[in-house]
C-alpha cells in the first residue's frame, strides 16, 4: 500500500498546559512523508517556547504569527500544506493511538476519498 501524505495543522494560542501532550500524541503516528505544521497564533504564555523546543527536535514546521484567531490560522495552515490530506488538530486535543494508520487504511480502501470524517471523545 502506497502511503498517502497527511498534513497535521496545529494552531496554538495560550495552551501551555495542554500543547505538549497534543504534540506527543502526533509524534509516534506520522511517517517521514507526512508534514506537521504548528502555528503559534500570538500566544502570550509559554506555549511558544514549548512548541519551539518540541517541534524543532521533530523537524516540524513552526510558524509564528500575530494573533488572528482560529479560523484564519487554520486557513493559513491549509494554504501552506503540501500533502494529499489535511487534519486540523486543536492544541488542547490529542490524537488517539492508531488514528493516522486508520486514516491511511480508509484512504486506500476507498480509493482516495475527498474527505474523511470521524468522531471524537471528551475526557
Region roles according to the model:
Residues 1-123:
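Nucleotide-sugar donor-binding/catalytic module of glycosyltransferases
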Amino acid at each position: 500500500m502506497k502511503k498517502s501524505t497527511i498534513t497535521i495543522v496545529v494552531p496554538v494560542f495560550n495552551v501551555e498546559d495542554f500543547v505538549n501532550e497534543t504534540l506527543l500524541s502526533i509524534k509516534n503516528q506520522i511517517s517521514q512523508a507526512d508534514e506537521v505544521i504548528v502555528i503559534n497564533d500570538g500566544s502570550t504564555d509559554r506555549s511558544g517556547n514549548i512548541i519551539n523546543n518540541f517541534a524543532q527536535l521533530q523537524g516540524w514546521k513552526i510558524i509564528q504569527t500575530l494573533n488572528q484567531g482560529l479560523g484564519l490560522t487554520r486557513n493559513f495552515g491549509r494554504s501552506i500544506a503540501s500533502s494529499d490530506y489535511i487534519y486540523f488538530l486543536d492544541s488542547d486535543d490529542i490524537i488517539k493511538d492508531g488514528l493516522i494508520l486508520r486514516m491511511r487504511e480508509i484512504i486506500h480502501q476507498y480509493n482516495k476519498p475527498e474527505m474523511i470524517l470521524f468522531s471524537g471523545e471528551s475526557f
